[in-house]
Design a protein with these regions (language model features):
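General structural signal for secondary-structure boundaries
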Residues: 56, 146-147
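Membrane-interface, cytosolic juxtamembrane amphipathic helix immediately N-terminal to a transmembrane helix
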Residues: 165-183
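A glycine-rich, aromatic-flanked flexible loop/lid motif
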Residues: 120-124, 142-145, 171-174
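Peripheral, non-transmembrane regulatory/ligand-interaction domains of membrane transport proteins
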Residues: 1-136, 155, 159-164, 169
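Alpha-helical heptad-repeat coiled-coil segments that mediate oligomerization/polymerization in large
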Residues: 93-96, 149, 156, 174, ...
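Short helix-coil transition/hinge motifs at the ends and kinks of transmembrane helices
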Residues: 134-146
């Protein structure tokens, strides 16, 4: 979870949070070295080309949320590979499928991923609703920044919805394979 203030993002996470560590490394790579450090540093280890620092704490929150959803996609890919293997095994005639415990665990993981994504989708939708209620900024630059924040928020929301769609498709696919196996 996050508490978003004008200039501060307060993340709430477990102690061993890989997302926090990954994003901290990404931020460090995007930050150019101080002029005094430049001479002592290898020029290839500077800032990542094309990387931008977040414009605000809200932008940082959305980037971290996007990284989290990217990890959901990776988890979905791993589950998909394993479920495809089991599905092929289930559909092979005259074979005895014996991996029921692992299959049920994978289904449970899919359900949990679906629930987490639904919670995040609800939170992001509430965030978007709150953004719509913000007073319009006076300056064109601030207005552009607000518009970019809304666009990035919708992008992350769509990213979450893609994960949910894939998870539900996998659930349906494996349930169909189990039904065919027993018919």
């Amino acid at each position: 979870g996050f508490a978003v203030f004008d200039q501060v993002l307060l993340p709430v996470h477990p102690e061993d949070c890989s997302v926090r560590d990954a994003y901290a490394a990404r931020l460090a790579a995007a930050t150019p070295p101080a002029p005094s450090e430049t001479a002592a540093r290898d020029p290839r280890s500077g800032a990542v080309a094309g990387a931008r620092s977040p414009a605000s704490s809200a932008d940082l929150m959305l980037r971290v949320a996007n990284l989290i959803v990217d990890q959901y996609l990776e988890l979905r890919r791993e589950l998909s590979r394993q479920l495809d293997h089991w599905q092929a095994e289930l559909l092979r005639p005259r074979t005895r499928f014996s991996n029921w415990g692992a299959l049920l665990d994978a289904r449970l993981n899919l359900h949990q991923l679906d629930e987490i994504c639904e919670d995040q989708r609800s939170a992001l939708q509430a965030w978007l609703d709150a953004l719509e209620g913000w007073a319009l900024p006076d300056s064109p630059a601030a207005l552009r920044e607000l518009d970019l924040l809304k666009v990035r928020s919708r992008d992350v929301l769509e990213h979450i919805e893609r994960v949910v769609h894939h998870v539900r498709r996998l659930e349906h696919s494996i349930e169909t394979a189990v039904q065919i196996h027993f018919s």
